[in-house]
Amino acid sequence: MRGLIRCCLFLCFPVLLWAQDGVQVKRERVFTGSGLYGFMNGGAEQFLEYGVSRLTARDVVYKGEDYTLEIYEMPSPEDAFGIYSLHIFKCERTDALGCIDCLSPYQLQAVVGNKYVSVVFSSGSSAAKDAVDELIRLYLPMDGKEAPQIPEILGIRSPYSGAVKYLRGPISVSSASTSLAELLEDCPFTGVWFVGDRKADDYQALIYVKDQEALKRLSEKIPVSSCIRQGDDFIYIKGTEEEAADEDHGDF
């Protein structure tokens, strides 16, 4: 009889976990390193450039709504912010949950410590949107602790979402600015804080270089009028995105 009771308890325990907080986990998958290629249809290289170590993806049902919750574990809060800064788009609400976050019509994205989090609700219903804040709090503490350190030299204040990007390597730099990517082609760097003005095609870039040789090489490329400030391991510049030359199609 005791054995039967133990067996029943063992079988019931997963059900109790399943019912905890009202979240039904339909599927859970974990990916590490190059395993990310098996999950993403393109774009894995960008995440790997930022040093993602682990992705936990869950398809869940919460309050009758379907969600896909993805938690990417990054080396640092700055790396988490960097990948976040490249993926947010059309935010209806920003930095409202006690951390850096962006709510769009079908997705909530956030930076929580060294984690980049994406919660997609494909229905786009008002019910799904209303419950998404509660859902993310069940998995992560949205307390703003271990927030990314945005350099004060940039002069930016919260909300940070959409105001600045953190670029870790050639792939992310190319996605932000073609002219900056060309400037950094032969200058090793460790990270770039990028502030762009789409209307004027102007930008500012705080570039942290790998060594003094890279700093010297970069300084020689940049006009004095474009250098805002320079330190031992960084150079802060302003620039303008160059327009692509129009192809010559004759009279057509």
Residue ranges and their predicted role:
Residues 1-2, 149:
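Compositionally biased, low-complexity segments enriched in small residues
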